[in-house]
From Swiss-Prot:
Its cofactor is FMN; NADPH; Mg(2+). Involved in the biosynthesis of isoprenoids. Catalyzes the 1,3-allylic rearrangement of the homoallylic substrate isopentenyl (IPP) to its allylic isomer, dimethylallyl diphosphate (DMAPP). Pfam families: FMN_dh. InterPro entries: Aldolase_TIM, FMN-dep_DH, IPdP_isomerase. Disulfide bonds: none annotated. This is Isopentenyl-diphosphate delta-isomerase. Belongs to the IPP isomerase type 2 family. It catalyses: isopentenyl diphosphate = dimethylallyl diphosphate. HAMAP family: Idi_2. The gene is fni.
Amino acid sequence: MVRAKRKLDHIEYALSTGQSRTHGFHDIDFVHQSLPNSNYDTITCETKIGELSLSSPIFINAMTGGGGEKTLHINEQLAYVAKHHNLAMAVGSQMAALKDESEAASYKIIRKVNPNGIFFANLGSEATIEQAERAVDMIEANALQIHLNVIQELTMPEGDRDFTGVLRRIEKIVLNSKVPVIVKEVGFGMSKETMQQLASIGVTAIDIGGQGGTNFAAVENERRQRMLSYFNNWGIQTATSIVEATSTNNNLSFIASGGIQTALDVAKAIALGANTTAFAGYFLRILMQDGIEKLVDEIDLLHTDLKFIMTALGAKTIEELQSVPLVVKGETYHWLTQRGIDTTHYSRR
């Protein structure tokens, strides 16, 4: 019951604390194209994460599950939206259902709603090979997310305090998983060094989960008597983390998440090097406050606006969008320069 209560607390506090919007995309400017040689009606948005083909560079990221009827209903509605727009979708951590079989229904509902959808299972880095297999089987998942959430755990009153052996555990899961493994952060971003470590053990897809969206340090601090306020602004901003990712020159697929709310955010993330983008808190807020039809409409508008932006840039495909010129400035440029990452290739391509 403690874990289920925590799931409901996370929804409540995630909605009340809001999105920080410190994702860094304001430091990214596209180079305007007066002769784009493009046609809105022929723009295509298909993309890939590793070997997984997606119809859209937008998917519904991990949010919830394991909190009884309320989380079942949320996942049911999100699965309907995913089916309507043919989007991939991830569930929240399934450890709750592995510990308590009665919670499995809140995850299994997505496959009932959308039998042919692309779904990602989700577990923390403490998971064993056997738990990973059970999580995948539970929802007949197409991929497995392993989330890294050190700062959330440290801020969580009942959270983990021992993070030894994590890389080795992930490696075992990667070597034994029957589906692709995506390693993701939960809002604190990833450094190039972390991504190089993950690539070295065979990980082929990473969700950088940058700072700028739902702040799980702030969420957990709401549940504490004594706040660890020094963690509230901890992390690497989303835009910065994407560039850190692409600077590794590894054969990795990258998912951009962390405060992404607009088609312009999506376009900038992809132009920086992401293969696709993921929405979580923003979609949850619309669903909970305005209803499912409003969320369906919002995703329609996101796709329309993304195609407008791609038309303006002369990018006919997502692959071409990854090659349009842009300028990195401000704090993002300063951070990357200090980290020894050259950004001039973005502006000169």
